[in-house]
Amino acid sequence: MSCAFGFDYGSRLIGVAVGNRLTASARGIAAIPNRDGTPDWIQLDNLRQNWLPDTLVVGLPLTLDGEEQPASRGARRFASQLSERYNLPVVLVDERHTSQEAARRFAQARAAGLKRKRDVQQIDAEAAAVILEGWLTGMTEAMPGAAAP
């Protein structure tokens, strides 16, 4: 099975999701600590070894006007690090509105009794799933400057 990873890059946490190309679905699997711009590479390495993704999709934070913002630089740097470390194609995609969709999904899961308030950290993983699903279904376009091995 070919799968892809999606990432929601943040200054403190990086949400990670895994997606299936056949079903165009994704699910959050982790929220990785990010300290001073340095991700927990050991945890990321373990996830990669367990899932063996063939493509990495990183959300690129943009303003509502579609312009890059200060957070875009961190996401681009992270995408470049992923490309160098894993020698896999890395795609940058527009992540506007993904956090709101992730929060909506999390609230629905809480209302259904599937999530607890203390699971709130998983919103980052859910945001990564939203980013990845958008790419898998072709709803989000790759942004210029995507890294490739």
Regions found by a protein language model. Give the residues of each.
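Phosphate- and other anionic-substrate recognition elements at nucleic-acid/protein interfaces
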Residues: 2-7, 11-149
